[in-house]
């Protein structure tokens, strides 16, 4: 990456926004007021919200099958992988938020400024494909949920899901807090649905807790290792790193004041960690549900429809089987898909503005972002006559794109947050810099392994 000269003055070893470019998510940037000289809890409430938008990326429909299959095949052993993945997510999202708060720019803007035109354009294409891949998984999840709940044909569900971009346009005019509240509500629905279903399943709590302890079999068992890689590889979503660096700037604070910046970093990180803990709980519940209900049944649980049907089949899940369990599962799937499409659309805008500085009306920008994602799904649905199995195969392919794009977001993030020139006194400390690079290298290796295995399975 080339050196980037800036003529803006620094204060308290921080860099102010460089140039006269547009702010990240300009229409909501700095719009949420933070009370001055307030107590801990009141200040925390002011900063609470962005973490929920980040957390939905860690419990989107693309993660569900892997988590439930992990429990169904290996009982509670892979809970330790869920825990480790969540800790990694917390570290990287804290870096992302700190980058946005200190520099006043998002990860996409900084990447564009610190690379040449060709490199920047290539990175934009890769990242745009990742956004499409993310949105594809969420659109498919929502469309299948609408079919399971209301009997809508898949093509109708896809179109309905695609149109929620219009709802987002209205919400943005009402204020960013409204978006945060809606996403938090959808996250709560997911949490309570799976908590209820796990309580009904009555897992052995001793075995559950033991599952969080590291086990050598995770590495020595090939099948277990592959599923572990699936959980870890799908945990850190590229678009969340861009999103986190942008929405951390929605709070209004004095960026020229060191104390205000430090406070923003502190409370944004607390909010992020709380919400990612909830995502950890949801992913744990998914795996626990798979273990408690499906371990030893030899059931085919590779698709959402299979899971939906299994929950109402007493021969598979026993006496607790009921249509209500299936409907609750579909409701949680719809909540996950809808909350994720909101954040995916926002991330798409951040990436389009940040990488290519595209100037167009917001409604057009969001519509283009959504059309780029929904078009492949509609084409697939038409070609395969709405066949759920084929549509879900597209979801699997979409995860490969996410794996490819991950290093192109993670490496710049670690570089930028480790830069004294960019971050001043808020740059990564030595231990976090080393840990960040170790995590980046490990995740890249894991994702390459996943890509090769996925392509081998497809062939």
Swiss-Prot record:
Cystine residue pairs: none
Source organism superkingdom: Bacteria
Show the ranges annotated as biased composition (Basic and acidic residues): 1-15
User: Which keywords does UniProt give here?
Assistant: Cell membrane, Ion transport, Membrane, Symport, Transmembrane, Transmembrane helix, Transport
**Record protein name field:** Divalent metal cation transporter MntH
Q: What is stated as this protein's family in its record?
A: Belongs to the NRAMP family.
Pfam families from the xrefs? Nramp (PF01566)
């Amino acid at each position: 990456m080339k050196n980037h000269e800036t003529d803006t003055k620094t204060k308290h070893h921080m860099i102010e926004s460089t140039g006269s470019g547009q702010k990240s998510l300009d229409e909501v940037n700095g719009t949420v007021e933070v009370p001055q000289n307030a107590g801990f809890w009141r200040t925390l409430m002011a900063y609470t919200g962005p973490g929920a938008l980040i957390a939905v990326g860690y419990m989107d429909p693309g993660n569900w099958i892997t988590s439930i299959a992990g429990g169904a095949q290996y009982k509670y052993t892979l809970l330790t992988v869920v825990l480790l993945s969540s800790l990694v997510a917390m570290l990287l999202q804290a870096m992302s938020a700190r980058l946005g708060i200190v520099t006043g720019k998002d990860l996409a803007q900084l990447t564009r400024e610190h690379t040449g035109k060709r490199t920047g354009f290539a990175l934009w294409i890769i990242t745009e494909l990742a956004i499409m891949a993310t949105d594809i998984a969420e659109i498919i999840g929502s469309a299948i949920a609408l079919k399971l709940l209301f009997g809508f044909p898949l093509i109708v569900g896809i179109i309905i899901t695609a149109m929620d971009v219009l709802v987002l346009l209205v919400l943005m005019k009402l204020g960013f807090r409204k978006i945060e509240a809606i996403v938090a509500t959808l996250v709560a629905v997911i949490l309570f649905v799976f908590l209820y279903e796990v309580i009904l399943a009555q897992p052995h709590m001793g075995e559950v807790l033991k599952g969080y302890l590291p086990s050598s079999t995770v590495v020595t068992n090939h099948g277990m290792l592959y599923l572990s890689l699936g959980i870890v590889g799908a945990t850190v979503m590229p678009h969340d790193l861009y999103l986190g660096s942008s929405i951390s700037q929605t709070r209004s604070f004095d960026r020229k004041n060191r104390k205000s910046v430090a406070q923003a970093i502190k409370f944004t990180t607390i909010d992020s960690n709380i919400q990612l803990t909830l995502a950890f709980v949801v992913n744990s519940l998914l795996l626990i549900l798979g273990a408690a209900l499906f371990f030893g049944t030899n059931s085919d649980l590779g698709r959402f429809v299979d899971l939906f049907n299994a929950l109402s089949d007493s021969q598979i899940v026993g006496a607790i089987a009921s249509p209500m369990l299936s409907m609750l599962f579909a409701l949680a799937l719809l909540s996950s898909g809808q909350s994720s499409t909101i954040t995916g659309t926002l991330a798409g805008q951040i990436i389009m503005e940040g990488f290519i500085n595209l100037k167009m009306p917001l409604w057009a920008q969001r519509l283009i972002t959504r059309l780029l994602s929904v078009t492949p799904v509609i084409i697939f649905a038409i070609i395969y006559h709405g066949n759920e199995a084929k549509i879900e195969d597209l979801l699997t392919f979409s995860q490969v794109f996410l794996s490819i794009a991950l290093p192109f977001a993670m490496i710049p993030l670690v570089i930028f947050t480790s830069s004294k020139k960019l971050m001043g006194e808020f740059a990564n400390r030595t231990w976090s810099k080393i840990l960040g690079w170790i995590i980046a290298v490990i995740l890249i290796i894991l994702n390459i392994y996943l890509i090769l295995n996925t392509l081998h399975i497809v062939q």
